Amino acid sequence: MIELKNYTLNFGPQHPAAHGVLRLVLELEGETIVRADPHIGLLHRATEKLAETKPYIQSIGYMDRLDYVSMMCNEHAYVMAIEKLLGIEPPLRAKYIRTMFDEVTRILNHLLWLGATALDIGAMTVFLYCFREREDLFDCYEAVSGARMHATYYRPGGVARDLPDTMPQYKPSRWHSEREIEKKNHNRQGSLLDFLWDFTERFPHCVDEYETLLTDNRIWKQRTVDIGVVSPENALQWGFTGPMLRGSGIAWDLRKKQSYAAYDRVEFDIPVGKTGDCYDRYLVRVEELRQSNRIIRQCIEWLRKHPGPVKVDDYKVSPPRRVVMKHDMEALIHHFKLFTEGFCLPRGEVYSSVEAPKGEFGIYMVSDGANKPYRLKIRAPGFAHLSSFDDMVRGHMLADGVAILASQDIVFGEIDR
């Protein structure tokens, strides 16, 4: 009698659907997945250890590079941990700015997820549509920090600087006519808040376009409905958070349950799924795009009416303004010491978490009283989600494994750390 053996397939890390550097060792029976073994570590950069060798303020930039699609949300968890140990509270205007940019970041993340997932499954048009909107939001990042991705904008005690009164303008070149430049600059004549307000007025129509292409699309539903079903009980046991947990029907959102920044001052709804499949997770993220847009509009309205400080007035934690520094020797000394030695935190330990686009992103920090952390532990939401991949994918076809992996929204910067 012929002995039949299962086929072993290496999926990634070079595969375009591997979401970075994921290597999957799949055991197949025909085209049905019997077992999946994720191999991680190919993007390990020792971020936790690096942060333990530098003053607190110098590690903010490392946070951007963990989940490099949810930059400011990662920064938020880190600076909140420092603020808890210091016992300081940022000004209310800084809280609103953080809330607004957290939601800008959420839209950036979900747009990339939607475009990449559609591309993995075979719908290319959505990818181009999503990147059209992402460019406008990257312009907002650039306006406040000078960088389009790794902003390093949040600071212990607030944010680096107030919102700008002008937006960067496109300049004439030999590749673009004056008419094209004028069209590109028509909504950049005012402040950042004006530019963002214009975006929030256009964006719901853009989301409608995505849904027209996908939500009732027969092929899209065949590829996502009843694929990768996770029950509420299993979702909790695996440690799911964010859209993965809400897609299984559990309305858990740190912005509501353990409110931080200005989330207790804005109104929004928590979308939840019913069956816990890939389609439900898609619907949850699409509705989160609309809710984030709603939160941003509320923040803009408040920020327009309430000018004020954006960081604490304590030179031990927050650098003095450049104008003051150039006229006051003491302020210059504070500035020099802050960016060379940094500041020391009281002895203690703290856990700080935010509702990042992928789930609960947490920072566990232990201080021994020095100017750098004794221990820094990063809780990445994608790590728990990827752990469940074998359980989610068993019994599905090989092509469905791509859809399930895409629905988890995996980014290896935070998983490997």
Curated annotation (Swiss-Prot):
Q: What is its main location?
A: membrane
What keywords are annotated for this sequence in UniProt? Cell inner membrane, Cell membrane, Membrane, NAD, Quinone, Translocase, Transport, Ubiquinone
The protein, known as: NADH-quinone oxidoreductase subunit D
Superkingdom, natural source: Bacteria
Assembly and interaction partners = NDH-1 is composed of 14 different subunits. Subunits NuoB, C, D, E, F, and G constitute the peripheral sector of the complex.
Which family, according to UniProt? Belongs to the complex I 49 kDa subunit family.
Task: Tell me the HAMAP family matching this sequence.
Answer: NDH1_NuoD
Extract the GO molecular function terms from the UniProt entry: NAD binding; NADH:ubiquinone reductase (non-electrogenic) activity; quinone binding
Q: Which organism is it from?
A: Legionella pneumophila subsp. pneumophila (strain Philadelphia 1 / ATCC 33152 / DSM 7513)
A GO CC annotation given for this chain: plasma membrane
- Give the UniProt subcellular location, in the record's own words: Cell inner membrane
Function text: NDH-1 shuttles electrons from NADH, via FMN and iron-sulfur (Fe-S) centers, to quinones in the respiratory chain. The immediate electron acceptor for the enzyme in this species is believed to be ubiquinone. Couples the redox reaction to proton translocation (for every two electrons transferred, four hydrogen ions are translocated across the cytoplasmic membrane), and thus conserves the redox energy in a proton gradient.
How this chain sits in the membrane, per its record, is: Peripheral membrane protein
Enzyme Commission number(s) from the entry? 7.1.1.-
| Reactions catalysed according to its record | a quinone + NADH + 5 H(+)(in) = a quinol + NAD(+) + 4 H(+)(out)
